[in-house]
From Swiss-Prot:
Catalytic site positions: D136 (proton acceptor)
SUPFAM superfamilies: Protein kinase-like (PK-like) (SSF56112)
InterPro entries listed in its UniProt record: Aur-like (IPR030616), Kinase-like_dom_sf (IPR011009), Prot_kinase_dom (IPR000719), Protein_kinase_ATP_BS (IPR017441), Ser/Thr_kinase_AS (IPR008271)
Regulation of this protein's activity per its record: Does not have a calmodulin-binding domain.
Protein's name in the database: Probable myosin light chain kinase DDB_G0284661
Matches recorded under PROSITE patterns: PROTEIN_KINASE_ATP (PS00107), PROTEIN_KINASE_DOM (PS50011), PROTEIN_KINASE_ST (PS00108)
Organism, scientific name: Dictyostelium discoideum (Social amoeba)
Lineage, top ranks: Eukaryota, Amoebozoa, Evosea, Eumycetozoa, Dictyostelia
Tree of life domain: Eukaryota
PANTHER family: SERINE/THREONINE-PROTEIN KINASE IAL-RELATED
Gene3D superfamilies noted in UniProt: Transferase(Phosphotransferase) domain 1
Region entry Disordered, spans: 285-315, 345-427
Keywords: ATP-binding, Kinase, Nucleotide-binding, Serine/threonine-protein kinase, Transferase
Length: 481
């Protein structure tokens, strides 16, 4: 039951613009009623597209975010719930993400890369110390909190508490940044985040992921075998130390891969200009007092109108590959658009209540796939299911040829059901084959690289992926998570 059934999110916030959309949610910009200058991102999740299992995913996201207080992790303030929606009040980050920064300004020099990586590794260290694995670290989920290089890690829709002794089994994430143990259908642990960090470091220096191909099956095989190399034309620009760190992070054997603490102790990270790093940290100070940590924007109002929000109850979930068909995605997306237009035009006509419950421990042996994404390119918004969800569980099958065949079949089938909702004018048209011919100082990723950022769900020997059909993904609006 809501802790305050007489209060609505619209009692505290004026919702203005839609700034991001996803399969199950819409993100809007809002300001606080009493402090107009304070802006927030409101993530509105429609219950019309949430079944019980997907609701559990939302509970996990809220539970993890509510426990995170770190300068390099997006802030979560409170949440509200009504019969129609679940609303998360989040920090608004207006300066774009890492992908857009590379596209607009080109690759980083080593000092810029060092500042970004130390901040990212600091966030990952914080999560790993709390037994949380993020599972979807990629440029689109790394947000710039200021113009000094300060970053925030966002989008915790796939994050999960886990036990190191048990590990995780069901694969999810984004293919171009996924570790070999995921594509090989192996039990994996927090080291998958370190692999993703290695891909990020490579990306910001060379303008593309280490594993990239227009052919999805080829990219899958490259990751599985761990086959990559430094670009011959540009690798000379960077020190042996940074290339050594990349090699250690992109180690195929997860047991030999650097941990986050080892990465922070690496010579290249340790050689950072502490004055520069300190100036970045000052731009996004860590909340220290317990009172500040628990204070929500709504608490700025009088006590009679205050609203509390605690973590919802978490329930164990059976192993699940959350797959939706293209038609279901199209329907859900249209419903979300209609639903949120209604919200924007008549925001005070409905009441949303703060949700309150106690968190419980989730059975770590039960694994889930969370498709609660809201990315601004629609290759990340839907997962096409062309296989029966009740397929036989061949747990010992690691036949990569079968995996690749399934991957290709899903790609071909989805080409016939492709749906784009971004404007053609927003497309970046640069041929990936011409990447090596771009001037070294201005090398930038093509927009087609967004096609590599697809959520995947792998269970045992089955490969399921969201594929756009067109290799050039059209760019959408800024998503703050």
């Amino acid at each position: 039951m809501p802790s305050n059934p007489n209060r609505s999110i619209y009692d505290f916030y004026n919702i203005t613009d839609i700034i991001g959309e996803g399969t199950f949610s819409t993100v809007t910009l809002a300001n606080h009623i009493e402090k107009i200058e304070d802006k927030y991102a409101i993530k509105i999740i429609s219950k019309e597209v949430l079944d019980n299992e997907r609701r559990t995913y939302v509970d996990w996201e809220i539970s993890i975010l509510s426990k995170c207080q770190h300068p390099n992790i997006i802030k979560f303030y409170e949440h509200y719930e009504s019969d129609e929606d679940i609303c998360l009040v989040l920090e608004w980050i207006p300066n774009g993400d890492l992908f857009d920064r590379i596209v607009k300004k080109g690759v980083f020099n080593e000092e810029e890369a060092r500042l970004t990586m130390k901040s990212l590794l600091s966030a990952v260290e914080y999560l790993h110390d709390k037994s949380v694995v993020h599972r979807d670290i990629k440029p689109e989920n790394i947000l710039f909190s200021d113009s000094y290089g300060g970053i925030k890690l966002g989008d915790f829709g796939l994050a999960k508490f886990y036990e190191e002794s048990i590990g995780l089994e069901l694969a999810c994430g984004t293919l171009a940044y996924s570790a070999p143990e995921i594509t090989n259908n192996q039990v994996y642990r927090k080291s998958v985040d370190m692999w993703s960090c290695g891909c990020i470091l490579y990306f910001i220096l060379f303008g593309r992921p280490p594993f990239y191909s227009d052919d999805e099956s080829e990219m899958f095989e490259l990751i599985t075998k761990g086959q990559w190399e430094f670009p011959s034309k540009t690798q000379h620009k960077y020190s042996d130390q940074v290339k050594d760190l990349i090699k250690l992070l992109l180690e195929n054997d997860p047991n030999k891969r650097l941990t986050v603490k080892q990465s922070l102790a690496h010579k290249w990270i340790q050689s950072i200009d502490e004055r520069s790093f300190s100036s970045v940290i000052k731009q996004s100070p860590l909340i220290t007092s317990q009172q500040q940590q628990q204070q929500s924007p709504s608490s700025l109002l009088s006590s009679s109108s205050s609203s509390t929000a605690s973590s919802p109850s978490l329930k164990p979930l059976s192993p699940l590959v959350a797959i939706i068909e293209q038609q279901e995605y199209n329907y859900n997306h249209q419903q979300l658009q209609n639903h949120n237009i209604l919200h924007s035009s008549n925001s005070h006509s409905r009441h949303h209540h703060a949700s309150s419950a106690n968190s419980t421990t989730v059975d770590q042996q039960q694994e889930e796939d969370n498709n609660h994404h809201y990315h601004r390119h629609n290759s990340n918004n839907n997962i096409n299911n062309n296989n029966d969800n009740n397929d036989n569980n061949n747990s010992n099958s690691n036949n990569s040829n079968n995996n690749i065949n399934n991957f290709i079949n899903n790609n071909n089938n989805n080409n016939n059901n492709n749906s784009n909702f971004f404007d053609d004018d927003d497309e970046i048209d640069i041929n990936q084959n011409e990447m090596d011919d771009i001037d070294d100082e201005q090398q930038q990723p093509t927009n087609s690289l967004r096609s590599s950022s697809k959520p995947i769900a792998i269970k045992k020997s089955q490969i399921r992926t969201s594929l756009n059909g067109n290799i050039d993904i059209k760019r959408g609006v800024l998503t703050p998570l």
